[in-house]
UniProtKB/Swiss-Prot annotation:
It comes from Arabidopsis thaliana (Mouse-ear cress). The lineage of its organism: Eukaryota, Viridiplantae, Streptophyta, Embryophyta, Tracheophyta. Disulfide bonds join 33-80, 44-65, 50-74, 54-76. It is found in: Secreted. GO terms for cellular component: extracellular region. This is Defensin-like protein 17. The modification Pyrrolidone carboxylic acid is found at residue 30. It comes from the Eukaryota. CDD domains: Knot1 (cd00107). Its main location: secreted. Belongs to the DEFL family. Keywords: Antimicrobial, Disulfide bond, Fungicide, Plant defense, Pyrrolidone carboxylic acid, Secreted, Signal.
């Protein structure tokens, strides 16, 4: 019993050391530019609906309702 506990402890320690030295992969962030939605009409009050419309209809990466004088508008975020 003591031998199996020692083996399990050793394997756990080896796993922790391996995970600690594993280098995370860095990916260069893609810059996004703001663009007013071309398909949204009216005041934007639902950021989730705006996001879905930007992604599905305009091919954007993201979308949200932002205040642009004089009202909230749906803004899509596209690669620059």
């Amino acid at each position: 019993m003591a031998k199996s506990a020692t083996i399990i402890t050793f394997l756990f320690a080896a796993l922790v050391l391996f995970a600690a030295f594993e280098a995370p992969t860095m990916v260069e962030a893609q810059k996004l530019c703001e663009k007013p939605s071309g398909t949204w009409s009216g005041v934007c009050g639902n950021s989730n609906a705006c996001k879905n419309q930007c992604i599905n209809l305009e091919g954007a990466k993201h979308g949200s309702c932002n205040y642009v004088f004089p009202a909230h508008k749906c803004i899509c975020y596209v690669p620059c």
